[in-house]
């Protein structure tokens, strides 16, 4: 008997919604990244995108442990000389809370075209409302 290998056209993708309020950032990100890859499915194939769509709500209420709210720094560069920008967790959570979760999950996905396709299936929103009710996402407890 041969080993089963999933085909891209035969993959069934479900929609899930995850509430991030009160959840620890890293623990939430590892579970979401694993589901985006499809590692929870029996037909997981490393070279095929078998993951599900994940909608994360309440991104502004995600938690970190210890003093990371003031000590954890996020860096980006504008591309111009002297253009290194930095912000700590608390500042970024007030301005762009979606970016915190997206950056944490993106770092856990493969760094290739397949990883970018997986990342496109992630939808992050700061509040409780999201525009994906037509897809009837199932509640996912983490």
UniProtKB/Swiss-Prot annotation:
InterPro entries per record: Ribosomal_uL13, Ribosomal_uL13_bac-type, Ribosomal_uL13_CS, Ribosomal_uL13_sf
Biological process annotations from GO: negative regulation of translation; translation
Keywords in alphabetical order: Ribonucleoprotein, Ribosomal protein
Pfam families: Ribosomal_L13 (PF00572)
Domain of life: Bacteria
Gene3D superfamilies reported in the protein's UniProt record: Ribosomal protein L13
Any single Gene Ontology cellular-component annotation: cytosolic large ribosomal subunit
GO molecular function: mRNA binding; structural constituent of ribosome
Quaternary structure and interacting proteins, as annotated: Part of the 50S ribosomal subunit.
Chain's role: This protein is one of the early assembly proteins of the 50S ribosomal subunit, although it is not seen to bind rRNA by itself. It is important during the early stages of 50S assembly.
Similarity comment text for this entry: Belongs to the universal ribosomal protein uL13 family.
Annotated protein name in UniProt: Large ribosomal subunit protein uL13
Organism field: Alcanivorax borkumensis (strain ATCC 700651 / DSM 11573 / NCIMB 13689 / SK2)
Gene name tied to this protein: rplM
């Amino acid at each position: 008997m041969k080993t089963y290998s999933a085909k891209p056209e035969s993959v069934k993708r479900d929609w899930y919604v995850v509430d991030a309020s009160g959840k620890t950032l890293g623990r939430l990100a590892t579970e979401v990244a694993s589901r985006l890859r499809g590692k929870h499915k029996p037909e997981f194939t490393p070279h095929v995108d078998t993951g599900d769509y994940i909608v994360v709500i309440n991104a502004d209420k995600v938690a970190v442990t210890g003093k990371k709210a003031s000590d954890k720094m996020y860096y980006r560069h504008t591309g111009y000389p002297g253009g290194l920008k930095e912000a700590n967790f608390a500042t970024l959570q007030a301005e762009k809370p979606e970016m915190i979760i997206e950056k944490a999950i993106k770092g856990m996905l493969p760094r290739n075209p397949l990883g970018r396709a997986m990342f496109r299936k992630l939808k992050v929103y700061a509040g409780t409302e999201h525009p994906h009710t037509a897809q009837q996402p199932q509640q996912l407890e983490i």
